[in-house]
Design a protein with these regions (language model features):
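Hydrophobic membrane-spanning alpha-helices of multi-pass integral membrane proteins
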Residues: 193-197, 286-303
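Cytosolic, membrane-interface loops and tails of multi-pass inner-membrane proteins
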Residues: 22-48, 256-288
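"…together with the soluble PPM/PP2C metallo-phosphatase catalytic core" -> "…together
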Residues: 2-252
Length: 303
């Protein structure tokens, strides 16, 4: 399946993300697009943010290239090309001017509606308990939650990008071993393109990070993973339960922390640093140890 030309294509994606991030970092510093130090942050000096714009942009261009080369369908182009473009754009605007939580939530629901509509998800018959439109709302809520949950992962250096690389690599390996990859070519193409894009950004985001992905990266990745879950489950490529296992620690940490905050904190939806991995990073004063520790823990969990 993977030809030399496709390996070259992935190498170009990787190199483009490296070069693009390097250039964007200079741009962000020049125009003061940085995360300053405050009581909510865990970094020790102002750091450029919004780097997710780069690997998101490279991914989107790659999706359009695959579409025009007739390697992926029109629906996949709309969801991962057009939809992810809006996801990254919303995130980047939030990185620059800070969108209110309510407005962000509306945009995220629109993104969820887009995915479910384009993929023409037929939710009738999944259960007799809810009708079609109720299932549509439940599915939309779950997609919005995943987008936000992935945003919560981006709390220390290298955490969100390493999570993406680990999750995608696991899925690629799973498809290769369990499923006939020839029957999942489009899914594999998207996963590998996303993987190459993320690896290109990792170099700059690994502790100590010289640039943050920001909401432009975390919302983009959350949207992509949500869309991948919908596409792979309705087409019987990857089961929903496999996705739950693969997300493991990352989803459980964000979900449990949010539920606890809903119970004990009045403004639970506000920015915070209460996740378990953030508490460890604050106590140990070392992002690298925590990020590596979570990776090792997650690998053991997957085994």
């Amino acid at each position: 399946m993977i030809s030399l030309s496709f390996i070259t294509f992935l190498s170009i994606i990787y190199a483009s993300c490296l070069l693009g991030t390097f250039c964007y970092k200079k741009f962000a510093i020049k125009y003061n697009i940085v995360s300053n130090i405050n009581y909510r942050t865990l970094h020790e000096e102002p750091t450029p943010r919004g780097g997710g714009l780069v690997f998101g942009f490279v991914f989107i261009l790659s999706i359009f290239f695959l579409y025009f080369q007739q390697h992926i369908s029109h629906d996949l182009m709309l969801v991962f090309g057009v939809g992810s473009c809006f996801a990254g754009l919303i995130g980047y605007i939030d990185d620059i001017v800070s969108i209110s939580p309510f407005k962000k939530l509306i945009f995220q629901f629109l993104l969820a509606f887009w995915v479910l509509t384009i993929f023409r998800v037929d939710l009738v018959g999944y259960s007799s308990l809810l009708n079609s439109w109720q299932y549509f709302l439940v599915a939309s809520f779950l997609l919005v939650w995943l987008i936000n949950a992935y945003n919560f992962i981006d709390g220390i250096d290298g955490m969100a990008i390493s999570a993406a690389i680990l999750i995608i690599s696991t899925l690629v390996l799973t498809i290769y071993i369990v499923d006939d990859s020839r029957n999942s070519i489009e899914l594999m193409l998207i996963l590998l393109v996303l993987l190459a894009s993320c690896i290109g950004f990792l170099f700059f985001n690994w502790p100590t990070a010289s640039i943050f992905m920001g909401d432009s990266g975390s919302i983009f990745l959350g949207y992509c993973f949500g869309a991948l879950i919908v596409y792979s489950t309705i087409n019987d490529k990857i089961s929903f339960f496999t996705w739950l296992i693969v997300f493991g620690y990352y989803l459980s940490d964000t979900t449990i922390t949010t539920l606890i905050r809903i119970i004990i904190v009045k403004k639970w939806y506000g920015t915070h640093r209460s996740h378990a991995y953030q508490n460890l990073a604050r106590v140990l004063k070392n992002h690298s140890i925590v990020t590596n520790g979570v990776i090792i823990y997650h690998l053991l969990w997957l085994l």
